[in-house]
Amino acid sequence: MTVYRKNISINVGETFSEDLTLLSADGSGVVNLTGFTAQSKIRKSPQNYRFADVQVGIVNPTQGQINISIASSITKFFQGGRHVYDIILTRPSGFKFVAVEGNALVRSGINTFVHYFGSP
């Protein structure tokens, strides 16, 4: 399986969730994820030591479907800008490999950091 490239967009302070279907390298079908486990992290840059865990659920293993999500309680601490993430799959044998990687555009809106100075 080759590394699948998928860019995502995340809004600061909102719950992020996206479903992905992993296809075989030759495009002949989906990857059977039965018995696999997955993990994911997002960082400001590949060299940055600070990261946030991304939840990965294998939704339908025989159809290669996974879900990645980040709770709003975590995204509220993100800084706007470009970040990077990847998803590492572990085969039942213990062999680990990067299955998905990409950029994450983190958008901070006008309501992200609200300061109240009296009544509106």
Regions found by a protein language model. Give the residues of each.
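Contiguous segments within soluble domain cores/interaction surfaces
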Residues: M1-P120
